[in-house]
């Protein structure tokens, strides 16, 4: 069977009921064909299986950027949350920094947690040299947001910016919101030791916020 026939079969397989059949999308990456980009992007928006989505992203990275980037940029304003998050994921894998202005801003504050998390990761990966401090200032506005997984994602994104994140996190430590202060402390601790257990860092941050630790992380002496 020639590559054109393989491509047609792979595109048709994207709508199959069985995820194992939909995984044939990998054929679209083996024989890159710009004509299939619309089908791939559309499927990303609705595909329920993580592994199939990952294969769709891989196939997109194999296509010409002149074709994929406009399609993925358009998905960033989709009403479907999965369309936005998958477009962000694919853009981060394509790794073309020209899309950075399309990511920073409202997507970093997207009401959908999965979209916001994808935006944080993509922004850190694609931030041009010299933009890290400004990005950190944007990211710290989300401190205290969501559950443990969401907070860990934001902490990791800020840690990915390295020392450029310290000034913004220092401001977060002085926030009037205790959740923001706790999250900022935990992130600074993670920045100091990226391999540390995050749950332990959060507990230490809580003690800092509660005033039971001094700035060096030592237990305060109880008052006489």
Locate predicted features.
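Structural detector for internal amphipathic alpha-helices that build alpha-solenoid repeat scaffolds
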Residues: 1-4, 12, 19-32, 42-43, ...
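Ankyrin-repeat and related helical/solenoid repeat scaffolds used for protein-protein interactions
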Residues: 133-184
């Amino acid at each position: 069977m020639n590559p054109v026939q393989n491509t047609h079969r792979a595109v048709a397989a994207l709508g199959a009921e069985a995820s194992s059949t939909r995984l044939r999308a990998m054929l679209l990456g083996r024989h890159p064909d710009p004509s299939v980009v619309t089908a791939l992007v559309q499927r990303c928006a609705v595909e329920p299986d993580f592994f199939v989505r990952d294969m769709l992203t891989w196939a997109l990275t194999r296509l010409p950027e002149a074709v994929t980037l406009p399609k993925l940029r358009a998905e960033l304003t989709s009403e479907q949350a999965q369309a936005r998050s998958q477009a962000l994921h694919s853009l981060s894998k394509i790794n073309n920094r020209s899309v950075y202005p399309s990511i920073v801003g409202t997507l970093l504050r997207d009401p959908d947690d999965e979209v916001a998390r994808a935006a944080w990761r993509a922004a850190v990966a694609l931030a041009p040299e010299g933009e890290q401090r400004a990005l950190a200032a944007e990211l710290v506005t989300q401190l205290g947001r969501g559950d443990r997984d969401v907070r860990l994602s934001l902490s990791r994104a800020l840690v990915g910016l390295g020392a450029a994140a310290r000034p913004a996190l220092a401001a977060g430590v002085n926030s009037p919101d205790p959740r923001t202060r706790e999250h900022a402390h935990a992130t600074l601790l993670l920045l100091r030791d990226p391999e540390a257990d995050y749950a332990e860092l959060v507990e230490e941050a809580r003690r800092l916020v509660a005033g039971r630790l001094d700035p060096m992380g030592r237990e305060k002496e109880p008052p006489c």
